[in-house]
Amino acid sequence: MDALSEANGTFALTLLKKLGEGNSKNVFISPLSISSALAMVLLGAKGNTAAQMCQTLSLNKSSGGGEDVHQGFQNLLSEVNRRDTQYLLRTANRLFGEKTYDFLSSFKDSCHKFYQAEMEELDFVSATEQSRKHINTWVAEKTEGKIRDLLPANSVNPMTRLVLVNAIYFKGNWDTQFNKEHTEERPFRVSKNVEKPVQMMFKKSTCKITYIGEISTQILVLPYVGQELNMVILLPSESTDLNTVEKALTYEKFIAWTKPDVMDEEEVEVFLPRFTLEESYDMEEFLQELGMTDAFEETRADFSGMSSGRGLHLSKVMHKSFVEVTEEGTEAAAATGAVVMMRCLMVVPRFNANHPFLFFIQHSKTGAILFCGRFCSP
């Protein structure tokens, strides 16, 4: 599980940086959702196509995309989807294949075994629009209606052979909630000279907090009820640019900076905006920039592990995500060196997220990053 968590974590941060490159827009994704969906495709990929996918997903360290990668995903997904939790978290994967196309039963069996994913056959050739709507309805059901139109108009056509969909939905309450009476409009500094109003929540509670000198950033951990999931927030100091923090951030550092022995547990005054983000990404371009090119090219893609037919290639990888952070908690959906804290006696540390920050929703036991984002502008 550890090699896989590291691979997924590395992929998560690579993607977070890529999607936010050179601009100050909000980003929200579920890296777990995206990587598990692509790992399903990897089951049917061979040769260079598979090698590029492993590279992009950072899986080359952990056994090069062999069976144990998929075994790792199976373990991780069953751990994450456990029913006996105090939060609601559901992931769902499905393959929608053109019904006239012959997919290998070994591929379908593996998808079912490792990813609990069924292959559903649709008529993309003559019922293109109905097929698209059918897929969107499935996603909406799996995300409690939060993700409605995953596939926009014209995203599938009569040449579509395979659409692979992942959906993830999360709803959790804070371990200690924010008091609604304390929420008030306050300014959020979008950039040096621009401020926008936000509904700023406030609570004073015992939290894990630390200060990372090398990037001048406070890190706060806000647990959800049951302590199995946390929101980890990286808030740079007023004078530090968020891009600087992103550039310095690696998965190894993320783990090192949030280790229990680096964190202080103390009473903190927390100011956090109430926010909702809804983002939609056409992933092809980003994945190609990360080196996964062959999978999208009809003449180069090798998916002979899926079908003996020729010309099978990925045409679309859509990801849509939703998060709502309120006083009670968070609702999210998506579809895929020693650090010394300066201590001052009797001063309650203040964590005031009134300027851009990064946030992660992490599964404590496995370390998996379920969701991550950057909040730059209300």
UniProtKB/Swiss-Prot annotation:
Broad class of where this protein is predominantly found: cytoplasm
N6-acetyllysine modified-residue sites: K196
GO cellular component: cytoplasm; extracellular space
Pfam families noted in UniProt: Serpin
InterPro entries attached to this UniProt entry: Serpin_CS, Serpin_dom, Serpin_fam, Serpin_sf, Serpin_sf_1, Serpin_sf_2
Residues with site note (Reactive bond): R343, C344
GO molecular function annotation: serine-type endopeptidase inhibitor activity
Keywords tagged on the record: Acetylation, Cytoplasm, Protease inhibitor, Serine protease inhibitor
Subcellular localization: Cytoplasm
Gene3D superfamilies in the cross-refs: Alpha-1-antitrypsin, domain 1, Antithrombin, subunit I, domain 2
Positions of post-translational N-acetylmethionine modification: M1
Tissue: Brain.
Family: Belongs to the serpin family. Ov-serpin subfamily.
Subunit architecture: Forms a complex with the monomeric form of beta-tryptase.
Job description of the protein: Inhibitor of cathepsin G, kallikrein-8 and thrombin. May play an important role in the inner ear in the protection against leakage of lysosomal content during stress. May be involved in the regulation of serine proteinases present in the brain or extravasated from the blood.
Designated name of the protein: Serpin B6
Organism: Bos taurus (Bovine)
